[in-house]
Amino acid sequence: MAAVSLSVSTVKPLGDRVFVKVSESEEKTAGGILLPDTAKEKPQVGEVVQVGPGKRNDDGSRQAPEVGVGDKVLYSKYAGTDIKLSTDEYVLLSEKDILAVVN
C-alpha cells in the first residue's frame, strides 16, 4: 500500500462534516503555574478550515452547512475525531456537534 501525504488541502469532509483547526490550550494557570500536557483541558474552540457539501435530505437534495471556512466555532468537548497534521491539531466533527459560532 502506498503512503498517503495528508495536509489540510487534501482533507475533504463528506456530508455534514466540518474540519476544524483546534485552538491552542492554555500553557499556564492564572497564577502562573506551567501545566503538563496531561493536566491541560481539551480545547473546545477552533477555526473551520474545510466544510463538507452538507447533509443529504430524504428527497436527495443537500442542506447547506450553517458554518463556513474561517468561522470560529465552539463544539462539544468529546465530539469528533482528533487528527494531527505536522505540528497542528484538528478535529473532524459532524455539524450537529457544533454548539455555536463565536465572534
Curated annotation (Swiss-Prot):
The keyword S-adenosyl-L-methionine does not apply. It is found in: Cytoplasm. GO terms for biological process: chaperone cofactor-dependent protein refolding. Pfam families: Cpn10. Keywords: Chaperone, Cytoplasm. SUPFAM superfamilies: GroES-like. GO terms for molecular function: ATP binding; metal ion binding; protein folding chaperone; protein-folding chaperone binding; unfolded protein binding. One of its GO terms (cellular component) is cytoplasm. Together with the chaperonin GroEL, plays an essential role in assisting protein folding. The GroEL-GroES system forms a nano-cage that allows encapsulation of the non-native substrate proteins and provides a physical environment optimized to promote and accelerate protein folding. GroES binds to the apical surface of the GroEL ring, thereby capping the opening of the GroEL channel. Belongs to the GroES chaperonin family. Heptamer of 7 subunits arranged in a ring. Interacts with the chaperonin GroEL. This is Co-chaperonin GroES.
